[in-house]
Amino acid sequence: MEGPGADGRGMTGARKARRSIALSLLYALSCVVAAVVLVISGFSYFVVKDVDSIGSSHAIVSGPSIGPQNILLMGLESRRDWAGNILPNYILKALHAGNAQAVANGAGGNDTNTLILIHIFAGGKKAVGFSIPRDDWVNFAGTLGPQQVGKIDQAYGVSLYYEEQKLKGQDPGLSQDQLAFQGNEAGRAAAVATVEQLTGVHIDHFAEVNLDGFYELARVLGGVEVCLNHPTSDVNSGANFPAGYQHLDPQQALAFVRQRDGLPNGDLDRTHRQQAFLDAVMQQLRTDGTLNDLTKVQALLSVARQYLITDAGWNLLNFASQMRTLTSANLVFRTLPIQGYETIDGQDANAVDPSAIQSIVHATFYPATRSAAPASVVGPGAKQPSPPVVIPSTGPQGGPVTAKNGIPCVN
């Protein structure tokens, strides 16, 4: 396996109420994981029998599924599936991620390339999400092994690796499935704890999807429409796009959300692309009749059943029932700020101020108590938060504010 820190349901949606649930939840839950959670939550409210088919995890103690809650969405960039099997060659090719032999020899990692923290306000009528840049340099929390600091996206892979090494030493006869299951559980616990420590808020639920799940989602949707401010080309991700409004097939969509090299703001621009991808999916579901097409709905739900993992205590039916009143006007995206760029241990990283981040997150999630310090900071030695700073503007950022058909242009 790779070393540490390497860099389902069915029903038509004919009624407007059902369509509104799905679209609103999609936008609120954001990016790759969000698209899958949306479909599950929106339709599972009407199709009770299919809820238990979603993969579940006991990595955290779940919070409530009704009322105010914090949800972490994780997109895992791994060349392996949940059982530890190497991804099919057609997906590796689409990812520009080498081949099966390279993965078997240790290529790739288990980084959380997408981390989005969502707060659902009481009553479910309002939601706000913070994208967490993957290169933020942080202290880890809940990780196994000697590495206790690094980029925030590495916390998952570090714990996964050392958990598997520990288990191999204890019982050399464990199967690949058993190692992968326990390793991923350790990774999830570490990723959640590290985000809690950085942001100072408790996470009630999480949802996780892998690269193969993203690819299959884009395939079922038939690709997405996006808009770029400038032409771009990157051999590492396979991105090669002209400027302007354009349709991306599934392979191109993967390159679009994975590119970081050659972008003016690197990983921050990639974060904005992930947000733009969400907008594109939302627009597509709104306009092309996907949610009224039983065949497409069943295909989307099949992707959810196969590729989505949520915490075992998240009652998606209760969650969906609360989200019925959410409108797109009450859904906002923001990106956690950075202080600048640094090279640490040979890695390009974002310098961050946890105290300032905690103040921003607390003031946004709990505005009625914004003068108070965050009460749920995780981890020893957490610093007293600085006074709140200006919150970044909403929506995908990083370029001229232009759009076509509701889809913003990004770098």
Question: What is the meaning of each model-derived region?
Answer:
Residues 2-411:
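Non-catalytic, solvent-exposed segments at the cell envelope interface
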